[in-house]
Structures are given as structure tokens and as C-alpha cells.
Amino acid sequence: EKELSIVEATKLPLLAGISTLSALKKIKDGAYFFKWTNDVFFYGKKLCGILVERAKNDFVVGIGINVANKIPDDIKNIAISMESDYDIDKLILKVVEEFSVYYKRFSEGKWSEIIKEINNYNFLKDKKIRVNIGDKIFEGIAKNIVEDGRLEIEMNGEIKLFSVGEIKIEKDYY
């Protein structure tokens, strides 16, 4: 297999996100969404977080899913668990299977199709958000995730593209 370029590697959190979302939907029906860049939401609350790190010439994808754990009271308004006993081995296998399917499509040059699918589950779409990057704060309306993985944000009638940043959703839109 060919080595991923840095540009391609920036798409791994999105690929892992849609793969995990797809696997979870096959295990438990419900309202799933993808929050750019690395979270899966279930009924408006965070169910899963994804972390991708480089290890020498490889990339390690970490996926944390709240399966049956009790959510502490202080974060119940923003986090959720699947609240059921699931066969963890089956869940892991389904996530790996879905990642393999999506990675194959990605390798075959079908990223445009995948990004459209991701946007179908875009949790931020049309929400008023605040993006923190260092000591700078940007506010606007989230739009689509574009081909290169950046998020479009409409600010003062103009579309700006963001590749990083901590996202806060204005409460009125959440």
C-alpha cells in the first residue's frame, strides 16, 4: 500500500468519523451526527471521540465510544452513552469493517462521495458557532465540510475556511 501524504492524512479523522457513525447505526438505530473534525453525536450529545496521531511513518487512529458507561452528572447535558450492554468485540469488529470499507473507497479516489455522505450527517451545518484558534475568536454560521476537510463558516456574508479550532455552538442553535 502507498504511503499517505500529509494532505491525505488530514482526512483520517473524517474517515474514522463516518466509519464509526456507519458502524454505530448498524448496531443501534437513532439520530447520529458527525461534528467536525472528530466527534460522533447521538441525539445531540457527544457519544464518540476520535484522535489521529502520527507514529513515525504510520498513523494511529484512536476511537473512544461511550458504550455502557455512566455519564457523570456534570457533563450529562453534553455527553451520552449508548446505555446498553453491547458485545464490545462485535462493536469493535463492526467499526473496523466499516473503516476498511470507507478506506478502500478513499484509496479508490471516491473521496468526493465520502465527503458528501459526511455532510449529510454534519452536526454543525447552519448552526451559529464560535471558533477559538489561540487567542482569536471567529463567529459565524457553519456550512459544509469541503473536499480538503476544512469547514466552511459564513462570516459577514463571506465564506471562510477553517482547518483547526475549538468549536463552541451558540446555545440558541443547539
Q: Which residues does each predicted region cover?
A:
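Long, positively charged amphipathic alpha-helical accessory segments at protein N-termini or as interdomain linkers
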Residues: L14-Y32, F42-Y174
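DPxDG-like acidic metal-binding loop motif
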Residues: E1-E8, L12-A16
